């Protein structure tokens, strides 16, 4: 019991603070990663927004029809 108390007093308080903050940060990041992977597997994919007629015309011109003058 006495040996443990001597070792505990020898630890730098700054080191303890760094370890606590580092542990919390690591926990936060791991938790976020787990939530992200869970969401990717289980949530339905986002619905695409409807494309306007103007954009559809532009896409059609890009794909098939050559622009005038070429």
UniProtKB/Swiss-Prot annotation:
One annotated GO biological process: regulation of DNA-templated transcription
Name of the protein: DNA-binding protein S1FA
Database matches in InterPro entries: S1FA_DNA-bd (IPR006779)
Lineage of the species this protein comes from: Eukaryota, Viridiplantae, Streptophyta, Embryophyta, Tracheophyta
Transmembrane parts of this sequence: none
Coiled-coil annotated spans: none
One GO cellular component, as annotated: nucleus
Organism: Spinacia oleracea
Cited Pfam families: S1FA (PF04689)
Motif mapping: Nuclear localization signal: 44-49
Localization annotation: Nucleus
Function: DNA-binding protein that specifically recognizes a negative element (S1F) within the RPS1 promoter.
């Amino acid at each position: 019991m006495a040996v443990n108390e001597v070792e505990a007093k020898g630890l730098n308080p700054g080191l303890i603070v760094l370890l606590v903050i580092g542990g919390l940060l690591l926990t936060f990041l791991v938790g976020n990663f787990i939530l992200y992977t869970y969401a990717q597997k289980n949530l339905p994919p986002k619905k695409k927004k409807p494309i306007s007629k103007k954009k559809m015309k532009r896409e059609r011109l890009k794909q098939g029809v050559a622009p005038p003058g070429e």
